[in-house]
Amino acid sequence: MRTGTENRPSRSGMGRQKRGKIMLELKDLCLSADAEGGKKDILDHISLTVEDKKFIVITGPNGGGKTTLAKTVMGLAQPTSGSIFYNGEDITSLSITERARRGISYGFQQPPRFKGMKVADLLQIAAGKKLSHDAACSYLTQVGLCARDYVGRDVDTSLSGGEVKRIEIATVLAKNAELMIFDEPEAGIDLWSFARLTETFQQLHDRLEHTIIIISHQERIIRLADEIVLVANGQIAGRGSVDELYPQILTETVRGCNMLEVDKKC
C-alpha cells in the first residue's frame, strides 16, 4: 500500500533554510536511576534545540533513552540535573498539567484505558471545549478509525491495543497543542491505519501550525522529518537532515544495535 510519500523528496533536500525561532531547548539533561551495582545514567548530558514548526524524529536503538527523553520534556520524568526551556521559559520544575497548559501534548507508547468513559467524551476533554459529533468523528478518521463504530464506545478492555493507541493519537490531535510529542505512534497499528496516520502527520506539518516530535524506528515516518536525532546510550549520537543521516541509519548501527524498521511490504 502506498501512502503518497514514497516519491516525495525529503524536506532536507529542499535546501538549507535560515534557522528559525527556538521553541524547545534542553540544556545538559541528566537522569539517573537505581540499577544493580549502583546508579545508571538513562540520560547523559543531553543538550538539544528544536526550532518552531519543525518535524523532528528521534530514533535509535531500544533502551537508548528516547522515551525517557520525551517523558522528561512532558514532565512525566524528572531530570537529575539540567534544564528545559520552552518558548524561552524554564519549565524544568513545572508539572505535567502546567506544561500542557503552555501547549505541550504527549501520546503515550502504551496509552491508559478509562473504564466508563466514551471515546467522544475523552476527545472533548482533550480538546478542552465542547466538540460537535462531526468534529469528534474527524479526529478518529484522521487516525484510520471508522468514526461511527468508535465514537460511542467505551475506552476499556474491549478495545485492542492498536485501537486504544489510535484513540490516544486522536486525543493529541484534538488538543491542538503547539508542541505535539508522539512515542512510537506506529506500535500495534495495522498497515492500512499506519498509512493513514503518516498522511495525517504530513498534513499537520504542511499546515505549519505545530512543532512535532516523534519517536520512531519506522522508515516512512523518518523520511517525513525535517531533522533526525539519533539517541543511544543516553546521549545524542547524531543529528542532521534526512539526506545526511538516513544512509547511516540504513547501513550502520549505533554501538551494535539496529536502529530502523524497514517496511518491505510497501
Regions found by a protein language model. Give the residues of each.
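The feature captures the beta-strand-to-loop junction immediately N-terminal to the Walker
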Residues: T59-P61
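Helix-to-loop junction immediately C-terminal to a conserved catalytic motif
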Residues: M74
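Walker B catalytic motif
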Residues: E184-P185
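Conserved ABC transporter NBD signature motif
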Residues: G82-E89, A135
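Q-loop/switch helix immediately C-terminal to the Walker
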Residues: Q110, G116-S132
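Conserved structural motif at the start of ABC-family nucleotide-binding domains
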Residues: L24, I42-L43
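ABC ATPase NBD coupling module
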Residues: D90-S105, I249
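Conserved beta-strand-loop-alpha-helix hinge in the C-terminal portion
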Residues: Q235-N258
